[in-house]
Amino acid sequence: MEPFMDEFASIGLDAVVGSVGNGATLRLFSDIKHVKYTEGRFLPYFFPDTFHEGGDPVKEAKVNWVTARRAILRSPIQRIGYGGYLKLALEFPDFVQYIKEVCQEFRVLYDNIQGTTPYCVKRVAVLNCWGKMRSWGNHMVHHAIYYKQNYSYFGIIEALSGAPFDVSFISFDDIRQDKDLLNDFDVIINVGDADTAQSGGENWADPEILTAVRKFVYNGGGFIGVGEP
């Protein structure tokens, strides 16, 4: 059951809790509809790999919060949390104090942005073979872990997660099924290696797709291709 597909609403799920590695991983669950609330579990987890003598959990927490915060402004979540062994966290009072500050900052954001629509400069469509089914996860490998072959492509999605754009993920089949679909957007972004689901592969040999995209550009729309679109 894909959370971005229409049938997801039928399962009656109360909430979605997701681990936050960066802005895109936050949008991966904050954009899910038909649930009562979404909650972000922020890093670091209270585990010995970070909470040890010489470790710097405050630095990791700051990087994580600042990276994800801009995405919260675009697509608000309702709750935040941390997890792990509390005993380890108590041994780092500076960390506890910083998390207190994060919680207060989140409360300010929550009070001011819930139920509002953020300002959007342009409407952007990310075009690939999956469309909305894999929104925000179309270039994601093992959460927010660095992956050499995919890093630059994922960086584009990460940038979009907190940018002032109304972002949608559309597929080539969406274009075939709705001749006027592209009229809803200002820019199309197509990202990926040749002959992959990310870039579209043989879809670009379809005259129907070529005609629709060329018409879109002719009428003033922007097309950004990265990699081998």
What residues fall within each predicted segment?
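Hydrophobic targeting/anchoring helices
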Residues: 1-150
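Helical hinge/lid and interdomain linker segments adjacent to catalytic or ligand-binding clefts
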Residues: 145-229
